Swiss-Prot record:
Belongs to the stealth family. It is an enzyme of class 2 (transferase). The keyword Plastid does not apply. It comes from Actinobacillus suis. This is Capsular polysaccharide phosphotransferase.
Length: 370
């Protein structure tokens, strides 16, 4: 009875709060690819941070951790010349969105993403940026001790170059000269949103984190939209099933990915025939392998080198009206100290765009990282 009285009193005194809380409970707001409501995010992050600090106090990190970005500037005339020379010969077998201009557009996200790493992850030993002989305009001598550019030709066999297929590029990340055993892979649309400890990615005993999503690969296929990422993940599962009794149905969260060079080498040793079979695909196809974002993390898990961990990552399409809502929410969260671990400002389909989506993105990133 007292509980009912309190609710009735709340309704009379603060009807807007009453209905807000009622709706949030009945229809919880979700910003991530995890089974957690927005109201749970801050507590989850705080709990994991406290645990990481306890572990940090009782252990010493045994190895360095690097960061790897892949990046392309689709407005570069030299890159465009190569693309227009080769792409038409491979378009017939390419997958959904493989040739969409959004895949190759540069919105200067890399600048903000790299600077977020420098600001919020100062323990990172070195940053490598993998490109097709391109250089970000902002990258000057001031960064030379911390950042190294890696050209595709430095790591990818020349018979597969040029390539415009991110799955192919990601299959060679372990070839980066002087790369540490433990590294974190970023796309340039993934951003650190707050200070993060090394233990969020790798424990002192070398165990990596695997950030699983609650999404279902089976449900994705049943909906009928067959993306190259989905097909490449399903192909990866078939390879994993040759060695492990798996029932994998979860992709990973669209965020950064802790990886190990030794697990790359194991994958190449076990699956060399299948890997060599998809490397000639200069554009994404439905016959690729999803290396960095699926095969290697799950291989690490089944080899006892990774364990599940939570990463609160906001994921949205920068061309969607929802992006404006997310920008406002992220700025508000930052102001009250409840920002997520990361966010992914994704761009994959240029067919539908809000007005001034690029300026909206610039304005938000400038405000968030100012």
């Amino acid at each position: 009875m007292n509980k009912m009285n309190r609710k009735f009193s709340k309704l009379l005194k603060n009807p807007h709060i009453f209905f807000r809380d009622f709706l949030n409970k009945k229809y919880p707001i979700k910003n991530t690819e995890l089974p957690f409501a927005e109201s749970e995010e801050a507590n989850l992050i705080e709990a994991h941070q406290k645990l990481d600090k306890i572990i940090q106090k009782n252990t010493l990190r045994q190895s360095d951790i690097d960061v790897v970005f892949t990046w392309v500037d689709g407005s570069d005339p030299l890159w465009q010349s190569k693309y227009h020379q080769y792409a038409p010969n491979y378009q017939a077998n390419s997958a959904l969105y493989a040739t969409d201009i959004a895949r190759f557009e540069d919105h200067n996200e890399l600048y903000y993403s790299v600077h977020a790493v420098l600001k919020f992850m100062p323990w990172v030993r070195h940053i490598f940026i993998v490109t097709d002989n391109q250089k970000p305009k902002w990258l000057d001598e001031a960064y030379q001790e911390k950042i190294t550019l890696i050209s595709h030709q430095d790591i990818i066999d020349k018979e597969y170059l040029p390539t415009f297929n991110s799955h192919v590029i990601e299959a060679f990340l372990h070839k980066i000269p002087n790369l540490s055993e433990n590294f974190i892979y970023f796309n340039d649309d993934v951003f650190i949103a707050r200070e993060l400890q090394a233990e969020h990615f790798f424990q002192a005993n070398g165990i990596a984190s695997i950030f699983m999503s609650e999404k279902s690969l089976t449900q994705m296929r049943d909906r009928g939209t067959i993306t190259p990422t989905l097909s490449a993940s399903e192909y990866s599962i078939r390879l994993l099933n040759k060695y492990y009794n798996t029932n994998i149905d979860s992709p990973l969260v669209h965020t950064y990915i802790p990886l190990k060079k030794s697990m790359y080498e194991l994958a190449w040793q076990r699956y060399e025939k299948e890997i060599l079979g998809f490397l000639p695909n200069k554009l994404r196809t439905n016959h690729d392998l999803n290396f960095a974002n699926f095969l290697i993390p799950w291989l690490m898990y089944f080899e006892g080198k990774a364990m599940p961990k939570i990463d609160i990552c906001y994921y949205f399409n920068i061309r969607s009206p929802n992006a404006l809502t997310q920008y406002k929410k992220l700025l508000n969260k930052k102001n009250i100290g409840e920002q997520p671990n990361s966010f992914c400002a994704n761009d994959f389909n240029s067919q539908k765009s809000i007005n001034n989506y690029q300026n909206q993105l610039f304005s938000f990133l400038n405000s968030y990282y100012s």
